[in-house]
């Protein structure tokens, strides 16, 4: 059994928002604690409004908990300022959303390389990795195409490659198959599982899809802001 420290630790995480009536705050997450190891694949499921996306945003440093502590690769994220958090996100994390957010004026390869520009110009090694990953997802012949020339499933595969280009330790996906038809969603779900294993990247996906959740090694159910 491995003695390696968890990649990600959440300790007593709560998230509150001001309520419309300005009395009791709206409690979205309530005292949630969790450990996630390197290379795991995890689905976060639960009814709408239970806090799934809020939890994913806190893990991805796009939101801050009201109380509690988040530790990633041994670093207490509350000690980092905005610039340091942005650098950590770019270095350690990749994001996939229901909408691909590709730049329509850029080619497939240019879109894939966007995250590498945070540290200057894309290198030859970046381009080679992008080319290899695009070939891996069956888009090796589409490098010079623009998003408008691709199907919905192809665009989402480009978004997956873009999320992996910087070799992140953590891949966060928010309803990645939500806008796809069933056949395309099935293929993308299997691709995510395969890449999770091939890249040894920890995959955390928020989903309403039972099919996608069943492909993950572990499923976490949120109910009323707590793990069920």
Regions found by a protein language model. Give the residues of each.
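ABC family nucleotide-binding domain
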Residues: 5-223
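Conserved switch/coupling elements of ABC/ABC-like ATPase nucleotide-binding domains
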Residues: 224-228
């Amino acid at each position: 059994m491995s003695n390696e420290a968890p990649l990600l630790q959440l300790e007593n995480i709560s998230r509150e928002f001001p309520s419309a009536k300005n009395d009791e705050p709206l409690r979205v997450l309530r005292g949630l604690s969790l450990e996630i190891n390197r290379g795991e694949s995890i689905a976060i499921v639960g009814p709408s409004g239970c806090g799934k996306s809020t939890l994913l945003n806190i893990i991805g440093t796009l939101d801050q908990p009201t109380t509690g502590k988040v530790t990633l690769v041994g670093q207490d994220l509350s000690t980092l300022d905005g610039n340091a958090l942005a650098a950590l996100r770019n270095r350690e994390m990749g994001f996939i959303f229901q909408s691909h957010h590709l730049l329509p004026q850029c080619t497939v390869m240019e879109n894939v390389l966007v995250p590498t520009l945070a540290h200057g110009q894309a290198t030859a090694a970046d381009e080679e990795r992008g080319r290899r990953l695009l070939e891996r997802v069956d888009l090796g012949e589409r490098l010079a195409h623009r998003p408008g020339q691709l199907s919905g499933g192809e665009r989402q595969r480009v978004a997956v490659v873009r999320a992996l280009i910087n070799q992140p330790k953590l891949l966060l996906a928010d309803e990645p198959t939500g806008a796809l038809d069933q056949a395309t969603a099935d293929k993308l779900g299997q691709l995510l599982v395969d890449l999770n294993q091939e890249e040894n990247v920890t995959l955390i996906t928020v989903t309403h899809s039972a099919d996608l959740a069943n492909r993950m090694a572990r499923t976490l159910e949120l109910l009323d802001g707590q793990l069920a």
